[in-house]
């Protein structure tokens, strides 16, 4: 449990699968009214790491979007591990933080007290957006 909580400080931006980036893509880049409405519906929940509107409204009905969700679940932990253990860019959190619904810049600051950890969170957000973007040619 402790190991899982150590890496969650930057991993699940917007919920499992880092779907905050997909929510913002739906909100700002979608060509269809359905995906844009889903982005409007899901942005409030995604800011508090609740991604069920996006998972069930977007990913479940478009199985092609399961691929980037799986890729983010594989790539982002590797990125966080490299930036915390090998490069030592951001500190490893020293405590368990179970308020998963706390928005990520706030929870990252509370658990690490480090600007570098917030930068790592933003790096993970950009990587997740780059993973979702080619798959989400939102019609």
In which residue ranges do the predicted regions lie?
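Alpha-helical transmembrane segments and their membrane-interface boundaries
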Residues: 1-14
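A structural signal for short secondary-structure junctions
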Residues: 48-49, 89
């Amino acid at each position: 449990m402790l190991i899982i909580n150590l890496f969650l400080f930057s991993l699940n931006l917007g919920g499992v699968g880092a779907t905050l980036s997909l929510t913002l893509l739906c909100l700002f880049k979608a060509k269809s009214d359905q995906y844009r409405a889903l982005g409007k519906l899901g942005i409030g929940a995604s800011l508090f790491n609740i991604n069920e509107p996006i998972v069930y409204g977007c990913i479940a009905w478009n199985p092609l979007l399961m691929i980037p969700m799986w890729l983010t679940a594989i790539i982002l932990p590797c990125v966080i591990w490299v930036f915390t253990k090998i490069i030592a860019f951001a500190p490893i959190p020293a405590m368990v933080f179970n308020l998963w619904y706390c928005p990520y810049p706030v929870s990252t600051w509370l658990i690490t007290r480090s600007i570098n950890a917030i930068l790592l969170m933003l790096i993970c957000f950009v990587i997740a957006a780059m993973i979702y973007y080619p798959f989400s040619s939102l019609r």
